[in-house]
Regions:
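A membrane-topology feature that recognizes alpha-helical transmembrane segments
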Residues: 1-130
Length: 130
């Protein structure tokens, strides 16, 4: 699963940075890879799914993009780490991204591309082993 995420990270980030949209084709590819991964590796704990669902619904109510939610959902379902800790990583990197864009353009952006923050947070979270 991590190889598929690594292979699609750059195209997803480029698409999200250019148009603020993650094309569904990338999420479909990741969905089929995740389905295959889960068929072989099995399902993780169901409490993890419940926590992930609560986080995703909260993000939906905060008007986060659907492509970002699909990507986060696939990552949270296929990895057996703490969803709350991972989302804290995503929040930190999204805030840094927001501050950098604000400093460069000298205006507060109305929206930001979240995919780079998602992938950087995943990489650092997996690398540090929290």
């Amino acid at each position: 699963m991590n190889i598929a995420l690594l292979g699609l990270a750059i195209p997803i980030c480029i698409a999200d940075l250019n148009a603020f949209v993650i094309p569904n084709i990338y999420n479909k590819i990741l969905f089929y890879v995740a389905l295959t991964h889960m068929a072989y590796a099995g399902f993780s704990q169901f409490t993890q799914y419940g926590i992930s669902l609560i986080i995703l619904v909260a993000l939906f109510l905060l008007r986060t993009g659907m492509g970002d939610l699909k990507l986060l959902g696939l990552i949270l379902v296929t990895h057996s780490f703490s969803a709350v800790e991972y989302m804290a990583h995503v929040l930190v990197f999204a805030l840094v991204h927001f501050m950098v864009i604000t400093a460069i353009h000298r205006t507060i952006p109305s929206k930001i591309a979240l995919a780079p923050s998602i992938f950087i947070a995943l990489g650092t979270y997996l690398a540090t082993g929290w």
